[in-house]
Amino acid sequence: MFRIALLLLCCLFQLSCVPIGQQINATLSTDASTILESPKAEVEQGRLSGLWQKTDEDLLAVFRGVSFAAPPLGRLRWAAPASPLPWSNEKDATEFGAQCMQSSSLSLFTESLVRGQGLPESEAQAVISALASRTPPPMSEDCLFLNLTTSNMVPAKNLPVMVWFHGGSHQTGTASSPTYQSTKLPQQGIVLVTANYRLGPFGYLAHPALSANDPNGVSSNYGILDQIAALRWIQDNIAAFGGDPNNVTIFGESAGAQAVSELMASPLADGLYHKAIMQSGVYSWHPIGLKRGFRGIPSAEVIGQSFFALNGLATMTASAAELRAISSDAILNAAISDRRFLGAFLPVADGYVQPDRVLNLILDEKTAPVPILLGYNADEGSLFYQWYQRATRMNHEFPNELPARLARFREVFSDDAEMLIQAYGLDEPERYKYGEADMLGDDSYGVHTRLLADAHAMRELPVYVYQFRRTPPRVGQTAGAHHAAEIPFVFDTHYLPL
C-alpha cells in the first residue's frame, strides 16, 4: 500500500516529497554550499540570489519565487498585470512564492485518481484521508511568480527555453508543484521556467464596470495576460540565466495546454515564443463571449454581475472600485460554495486578448504559425466519468437505465447516433460505462486536438501528434492512461519506478 500511497501523496500536485532513487537535494547541498557562492543573476529589476541543486551528475542553478509582474492588488485586481517593482538590495530567490487564490479542498478528480489505481478500498481511503487533511501551500492574490532552473549561468549561452503553464481547469494549480520541478530537462541543456497565473474569479471574472474601467474596454482573461507578462519578462531577462530569448517553447497540460492554444490565438503574445506543446487540451470548445451568451447561458459580463449580486457581495450596478474593495476571502468562498458558478470563470472571446473564439480563429487560420506538438491520453475520460453524470445547467437529469440513456443519446446526436453507438459499444450493457467514458475523453480532448492538428497541417505548418497509452502498473487498476498520466514522464519526476 505505502509504495502506491507515496506515489499518490507526492504526485497529486501539492505535497513536497523527494523522488525515490533520484537522490536530489532540494536545498543547497553541503558540498556546494561550502565550495560555491549561491548563483546570482542580474535582471532588469535587480540582483537575484538563488540556490544550487545537486543531482547525480552535476549542479543546477535554481531561482524560485521571482516576480514577473507587480502584485495584482488594489487597483491592479482585475486589471492587466503591471511591470514588476524594482529592488535595491540583493533579493533572495530560494523559496517558492504563494500560489494564486483557489480552493484547497480535495477534488473529485483526485479521489477518482486514487481509487483508479487498483488499491484495496481501505488503503485507497487512507490515501484520500491523508490528502484531504494535508496543509495547503500558502495562498495569496500576490502570486505572480515564476521559477527557473538552468544548467549554465553564463549570460547569453543561448540554451533553449521551455515555459510551463500548469493545469487545473483554470481554477486551481501552482507552478511550484513538486511534479513540475524537473532536473532532467535542465540537465539536457534546457532552461526550465514554470509560471503562476491568476485563477477562477480572480483570473477570469468579467463585469461591465471592469470593462468600462479598462483602457481597452474589456474584462476577464487576466490569467492569459499574466502568462503574456511572464513571457515578456522571459524575453527581457532569460539571457541572464543562459537562455535564448529567440528559442522559447511554451507547453502545458489540460488547462495549461488550453492556455497555450489561447496564447496562439492572441495577437498580444506574437513573437514572445517560437514553438508550442499542448498535452490534453485545446481551447476550441468554450462558446461564451464577453458580451455574448450561448443557448440560454448569459454572457461573461452578466455572469460576473450575477455572481456578486446573488452572493450579496455587490449590487448589479456596482463600480469597479466597489468590486475591488471586496475581500479576497469573500470572493473565493462565494465561488467555492455557490455551485451555480462552478466552472463559470473561464477565458472568453473579448475582442482584444482573444479576438474571437479559439475555434473560429483555428478555422480562419489566424492562430500563430509556429511548430506544434500536441496529443492526448488513451483514457482521458476515465477520471471524469462521475462528473459527467452529474446534473448541469444544460443537462438537468441523467437517466440511469440503458434504454433511457440510448434514447437521450439518439435525441442529441440524431443521424450520427447509430454510428457512435456502434463505434463505442454503447448498446452493450457490460461495455456501456467504458464506451461512454471513452467517448467522453474523445469529445473533451481528442476532437479538439485533431481539429487544431488538421488545421495546422492544412496550412503546411510543422505539426506532430501523439497519444499516450501507459497505464498504472497495479493489477486491478481502472484509471487506464488517464488524464495527466503523462506529466511525470515529461518531467521525469516519478515517485516510484514505473
Predicted segments with their positions:
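Active-site rim elements
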Residues: 131-136, 216-221, 287-295, 349, ...
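Alpha/beta-hydrolase fold nucleophile elbow
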Residues: 242-253
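Substrate-access "cap/lid" subdomains that shape
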Residues: 236, 262, 270, 275, ...
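Bacterial N-terminal signal peptides
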Residues: 5-14
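Mobile gating loops/cap/lid regions near enzyme active sites that modulate substrate access
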Residues: 386, 438, 446-498
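Non-catalytic accessory segments of hydrolases
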Residues: 18-221, 245, 403
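Glycine-rich nucleophile elbow surrounding the catalytic serine of serine-hydrolase chemistry
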Residues: 252-262
